[in-house]
Amino acid sequence: MTTTLQQRESASLWEQFCQWITSTNNRLYVGWFGVIMIPTLLTATTCFIIAFIAAPPVDIDGIREPVAGSLLYGNNIISGAVVPSSNAIGLHFYPIWEAASLDEWLYNGGPYQLVIFHFLLGVFCYLGRQWELSFRLGMRPWICVAYSAPVSAATAVFLIYPIGQGSFSDGMPLGISGTFNFMFVFQAEHNILMHPFHMLGVAGVFGGSLFSAMHGSLVTSSLVRETTEIESQNYGYKFGQEEETYNIVAAHGYFGRLIFQYASFNNSRSLHFFLGAWPVIGIWFTAMGVSTMAFNLNGFNFNQSILDSQGRVIGTWVDVLNRAGIGMEVMHERNAHNFPLDLASGEQAPVALTAPAING
């Protein structure tokens, strides 16, 4: 008997690299999307940290009134932010090499564009990496579909809204108080609280929280006892076990009697699909709402107050929203020559600007 030994051809360096990139045996899966994701997210994170700590004031409104956002210029963790790029730049792409100097680039808010462009590209690739890893492992692709909800929301506030408003200075600042300022101004200019898509988003987020708490508490309350009373119930589960760790029949019976029979799921798969779909669809609607309001397709506006037969104002919740919106909009426009046009023009309409007198 003759045995022939053939030496295996060594794989090229490129093939070895491809195998390492796509290997699911690595501690952290890289993937082809990860090749772009890793450097872009590292760049965005590094620039954000440096700008949050030490960036000089930015002329956000383009009127030579710089706004300081970094820690070294008097802010704290709550008030600090990476200030959006200047209104003088508008929607122009503003990399470092487009500025005459580094000082000019910093003054016009160049770090903001650098952070958001690299961040958005990074999270897009993170979404693609989720699909890629699911594909390699033979899983279904719903993880990346769920992740598309926060990705679409981030894209709406950082990219779509500035495009619709005509300037990256209208983008959301990268900070805690900057986020709240963005929300106030958004309400003042677009009446987002009266937009149906925002209402669906609120239902998605709060409803998702409620359903998550209900599901977790039901499962925890119907665990199959595998331990003694002096041991933690967590020891009753072994990773990879085939047996159910909780009694879905008991949970179904409890919840069906607590509310009514058909309010409870009797199928674990449909239950978990519902838990995933509800908040995702809600946040999708919010992202669509912000994207449409970016082009000034705003929420419902009830600008005229309700009047009685003698012309006196009947105060409603709408009047409260209108008064708050007008106040926030005026405070937002810091320079007189850029007074909000919807406040400076138009026919006079009776609006409840004073609190009703209470006689008692």
UniProtKB/Swiss-Prot annotation:
GO biological process, one term: response to herbicide
SUPFAM superfamilies according to UniProt: Bacterial photosystem II reaction centre, L and M subunits
Its EC number(s): 1.10.3.9
Site feature (Cleavage) residues: 344-345
Gene Ontology CC annotations of this record: photosystem II; plasma membrane-derived thylakoid membrane
Pfam families recorded: Photo_RC
Positions annotated to bind a quinone: 215, 264-265
Cofactor binding, per record: The D1/D2 heterodimer binds P680, chlorophylls that are the primary electron donor of PSII, and subsequent electron acceptors. It shares a non-heme iron and each subunit binds pheophytin, quinone, additional chlorophylls, carotenoids and lipids. D1 provides most of the ligands for the Mn4-Ca-O5 cluster of the oxygen-evolving complex (OEC). There is also a Cl(-1) ion associated with D1 and D2, which is required for oxygen evolution. The PSII complex binds additional chlorophylls, carotenoids and specific lipids.
Keyword Magnesium among record annotations: yes
Membrane-protein topology: Multi-pass membrane protein
Annotated site, Tyrosine radical intermediate, chain positions: 161
Mod. after translation: Tyr-161 forms a radical intermediate that is referred to as redox-active TyrZ, YZ or Y-Z. C-terminally processed by CtpA; processing is essential to allow assembly of the oxygen-evolving complex and thus photosynthetic growth.
CDD domains assigned to the protein according to its UniProt record, in alphabetical order: Photosystem-II_D1
Residue numbers binding chlorophyll a PD1: 198
InterPro entries: D1/D2, Photo_II_D1/D2_sf, Photo_RC_L/M, Photo_RC_L/M_CS, PSII_D1
Enzyme class: oxidoreductase
Transmembrane segments: 29-46, 118-133, 142-156, 197-218, 274-288
Record-level Gene Ontology MF annotations: chlorophyll binding; electron transporter, transferring electrons within the cyclic electron transport pathway of photosynthesis activity; iron ion binding; oxidoreductase activity, acting on diphenols and related substances as donors, oxygen as acceptor; oxygen evolving activity
Site (Stabilizes free radical intermediate): 190
Sequence positions that bind pheophytin a: 126
Binding site for chlorophyll a ChlzD1: 118
Record-stated family: Belongs to the reaction center PufL/M/PsbA/D family.
Misc. remarks from the entry: Cyanobacteria usually contain more than 2 copies of the psbA gene. 2 of the reaction center chlorophylls (ChlD1 and ChlD2) are entirely coordinated by water.
Protein's recorded name: Photosystem II protein D1
Species of origin: Microcystis aeruginosa
Biological classification of the source: Bacteria, Bacillati, Cyanobacteriota, Cyanophyceae, Oscillatoriophycideae
Gene designation: psbA
